[in-house]
Swiss-Prot record:
Residues of the R3H domain: 182-245
GO cellular component: nucleus
Name of the protein: R3H domain-containing protein 4
Coiled-coil portions: none
Annotated source species: Mus musculus (Mouse)
Length: 262
């Protein structure tokens, strides 16, 4: 005989005067009582255990279907005891997995529109687009970070003093010690300014047989952050000047004006 708990939670006496200990969990709690909430997996475990205990109290099932149901119940109980059931929603907070890049692209209307436009094009147009993207990627890797970006206006490295220090030491010593023909220096500054302001990506060429004039042109080019080189051409010296940047942005103070201030 199983005794039930009384209202105070203690053991209940039988009519014969005997005191029996209560067995909690034999009957489901009443709706008015305060019950500690348990997870879904624990409730499932409780009902499975209760079904197994009840099956031990009743005669063994003789039918094949009844026996199969009993074996299935015992098998489920074994799985829960050994491996443990998967946690339910009430067992803990389930953090949703972060969406992958493909899922994010599919949810973005702009990406979907670009993808649909690409897929609706012919095979030749698709190859042309892919080839362009590949060449653009390789060009960025060759240029490296920041190459082609002209920041001489806000970068303190391009102040007149730093521009002068960009000139080689030998040329700086010549400019400081010698009496520089300012008219020749200003003439080359005007030519380079007029040429590269119109065609920043072109190459300026000039035939110069005078070595001192070539020296002045090299100094002006280094001050303006231009690339200069000389080579023999049919018995004469040819100067080639090119711009290392995408745009031509000369210093605010030219070399001739900087030397006048020294």
């Amino acid at each position: 005989m199983v005794a039930l708990d009384n209202s105070e939670g203690g053991p209940e006496a039988t009519p014969s005067g005997e005191t029996r200990l209560s067995l909690p969990g034999c009957l489901p709690p009443l709706s008015g009582s305060q019950v500690k909430r348990v997870s879904a997996s624990r409730r499932k475990q409780h009902f499975i255990n209760q079904a197994v205990r009840n099956s031990d109290l009743v005669p063994r099932a003789k039918g094949r279907k009844s026996l199969q149901r009993l074996e299935n119940t015992q098998y489920l109980l074994t799985l829960l005891e050994t491996a443990g059931g998967p946690p339910g929603v009430e067992d803990g907070d389930l953090t949703p997995a972060a969406p992958g890049i493909f899922a994010e692209a599919c949810s973005n209307a702009t990406y979907v529109e670009v993808w649909n436009d690409f897929m609706n094009r012919s095979g030749e147009e698709q190859e042309r687009v892919l080839r362009y993207l590949e060449d653009e990627s390789q060009g960025k890797r060759r240029r490296g970070p920041g190459r082609g970006e002209d920041r001489r206006r806000e970068d303190p490295v391009f102040t007149p003093h730093e521009c002068f220090r960009r000139i080689s030491r030998r040329l700086r010593s010549v400019l400081k010690r010698s009496r520089i023909p300012m008219e020749t220096l200003e003439s080359w500054e005007e030519r380079l300014l007029a040429f590269f302001s119109v065609s920043p990506q072109a190459v300026y060429t000039a035939m110069l047989d005078n070595s001192y004039e070539r020296l002045l042109l090299h100094a002006v080019c280094q001050y303006m952050d231009l690339i200069s080189a000389s080579a023999d051409l049919e018995g004469r010296r040819q100067m080639k000047v090119s711009n290392r940047h995408l745009d031509f942005l000369p210093p605010e103070l030219l070399l001739s004006a900087y030397l006048d201030q020294q």
